[in-house]
Amino acid sequence: MEGFSRDLLCGIGKGGDGPRGEVRPRVDMEAEEVELNLGLSLGGRFGLDRRGEKLARSSSVAAILAAPTEPSAPPSGLFRTSSLPTVAAAEAAKKQGVDELNCRRPSGGAEAEPAAARLPASGSPSSGSSDGEGRRLEVNMTDTLMRTSSLPAGIEDEWRKRKEAQSLKRLEVKRKRIERRNSLTSNISKEAVGQILEEMNAGAEKVESCDDVATGNKKTGGNVNHSSDRNRCTGLPPVHRATYTQQRGSLSGIPTKHIPAMKGSADAEEHNVPSAATEHRNGAAIATPPFSALAVRAVALASRGEQLRATGRVAARAKSMGDVERIMMQEMPCVCTKGLPNGKRVEGFLYKYRKGEEVRIVCVCHGSFLTPAEFVKHAGGGDVANPLRHIVVNPIPPSLY
């Protein structure tokens, strides 16, 4: 082998067993030969004349080398090209490699280097080409192509910035939603507190007006109980009155509360009215409810709402029970006996009275299932010829419609 591998595919394109350097004359055959070479993949010349000059197969295997047998001109076959774009520098290196190969051929191929140590100018290891006799063209690689990317270098930074902007936008929207919900809740609570304060102020004004009337009656010598009766007629709730007395130049923090009852005795009313007059004379009366009244009123409103909801549930349940009772009365109406000799009356309800079924009556007193004759007999009427004449169906009450 002399250190060179043998090209086993070199003779497929030629199709003969003759010596390598012998050129056999081309024989035109009427029948078209089977195309076995790779002319289609190598860009073969196929036009109107399909039996024209065929192209020699070029090997793309870099490990196949053949020793040149005789010096000859450079091969005239077409070289295998690469799909990568070629540059001017690669073309210049290719021409230089052809010149070097022409200079080395007379030496008998002793200076041939392994294919693994050389790369073609096109940048592909399979871009070397050889003719049908196994000659291979080798060129030195002078310039290399830079590896390119399908995405620009700064696209990752843009994506990261876009994701950060989206996350910030989501956080802003969430914060605004929470603030809006909190503001709605606070507005509702403020409105409720304001309404409670307005009601309390209105009640305090009414109490002050009643106290002024009572004081005027006391000064003019009128009947004091008349003002208390008027205060009772207004239907106002018990008023919490806190009085502060000046002792030793400072205000004492012990309030005195007077709560007149709606239905009290005359002695209690006479005891409370002079104390109120004394407060007005001293000028230290303050007709403002205590601070805890606000919390008490809020709790009362909450309990009232709960009672209303419970009442609504009870009403709905009663309505549903009324519907069930009405349906039961329509399906199983009540009956009773009438016109019996002993005058006894027994009540029951129809259990079966549909067409094709035997009528059954359930006795209320015992819960027995009886026929009409047995029901009349159970009432003490005995055996009668037509028991249905002694049984009356009670009408459904109008409240169940």
Curated annotation (Swiss-Prot):
Keyword Nucleus among UniProt keywords: yes
GO CC list: nucleus
Residue numbers spanned by region Disordered: 95-135, 215-238
Keyword Nucleus: yes
Keywords associated with the record: Nucleus
Subcellular location: Nucleus
Biased composition (Low complexity): 105-130
Protein name: Ninja-family protein MODD
Organism phylogeny: Eukaryota, Viridiplantae, Streptophyta, Embryophyta, Tracheophyta
